[in-house]
Amino acid sequence: QSHISKARRPYIL
């Protein structure tokens, strides 16, 4: 619950 919240853009961890 910090980087990818509610599918906000495709983040690459």
Swiss-Prot record:
Compartments (UniProt record): Secreted
Biological processes annotated in GO: blood vessel diameter maintenance
Tissue and organ expression note: Identified in brain, intestine, and rectum, but not in stomach or skin.
Modified residues (Pyrrolidone carboxylic acid): 1
Keyword vocabulary terms for this entry: Pyrrolidone carboxylic acid, Secreted, Vasoactive
One Gene Ontology cellular component: extracellular region
Role: Smooth muscle-contracting peptide.
Protein family per UniProt: Belongs to the neurotensin family.
Protein name: Neurotensin
The organism's taxonomic lineage, starting at the top: Eukaryota, Metazoa, Chordata, Craniata, Vertebrata
